[in-house]
Amino acid sequence: MLKNKYIYIIGGLLLFCVSLQTKAQNHLNSPYSRFGMGDLMSRSATAVASMGGTGYTYQSPIAINFSNPASYIAFDTLAFLMDASFSWKNHTLAASTGSSQKGNTMVFNYLSCGLSVQKWWKTAFGIQPYSVMNYSINNPNQVSNNDTFNVAYFGEGGINEVFWGNAFRLFKNFSLGVNASFLFGTHSKNRSVEWKDVYSFNTQVSNYNKIRGAIVTAGVQYFIPVKEKGELGLGLVYTAPIPIQSKGNSTIVTYWGTGYGATVIDTLYPDKDKTYSHKMPTVIGGGLSWGKRDKYYVGVDFTWGNWSQYAIDKVSDSLADSYKLSIGGYFTPNHLSSKYFPRMTFSLGANVEQTRLVLNGEPINRFGVNLGLFFPLKKTKTGFGLSIEYGQLGTTKLIRENYFVATFNIRIHERWYQRKKLD
């Protein structure tokens, strides 16, 4: 059985992560989150994120890699695994007009657990944010010398993901895994037109949606040993384009004045409890790696997402297909050493991505570089991880985001099946 101290740790981490997720609704202003499902989260374990998101062929007996569910097969047969992660993010938004905005926030990344059912069957489950929406955009306009108005776009919300995955060893060095996820959350999108003339009518259109749905991701991994030198790894991941549903309400409000001094003149409800169908994309990823278990790993991943097919009730959101290339790896000098430093793990990675956004003919690209360290506790496989990332999103022709992210995680490895020996 699990020791009581680990039960308390897990419970405490769960409460802490849930509180962070609640606060995550007050996310940094991100104008690009206005489109589609919002800003898509990395949905990668810290061990994978610290390698630039390279994880389709990554396996570990002490880490939960939900980027490819086939990796669960490597779990220690006699252990219970738990991994929790949160990040601190600092960013600067720079617009083509020369204006800029800075901010920082704490973000919950995930809480996941894994264990062995049989030697040939391993399972994992957890919760993580799927996407976050938070934006505020003002667009001043002038129609005459004294007649001006402002168009404002603002929204907030987020989608969470609860997943359960299983991996099976079909034959030696080959595993198949499946993650089944349930998505839930809300989106609030608003658009207002306000005139400078206080006697003019202003208008605000609001749309509120509750989102529910499921996604299924399947993955395979195959490793080819090359004598005593290492092994070649091959990985493939496929996410099926299963539609998800939302139920929404919309309102149109006409009013005088602005802010707290506004007086409502009329309110219309054109849509109430209307059900929408979101056509989701097909996502395919593949990876290739070379490494030696518990010693070193170098991999490269490529991901394609068919976001051009994303639509709400057959209405396109002007998205494009996404492409991402990641490369990274880790090095552990000697995980069996009695000294501390050789047992540490050092990670490095980078990625470039053509995101699903194309605005005013400009593709919105992203790149990032990552560094990571894992600090094991003495005489155990439990430990703490630290990963830092610097990246850029967008273009100076529109809005560019420069960001720095520091990610912290705790990884618990508890042997709970082992029987005590009797003298």
Name each model feature, range by range:
Residues 25-423:
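Subset of outer-membrane beta-barrel
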Residues 1-29, 423:
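Bacterial Sec-dependent N-terminal signal peptides
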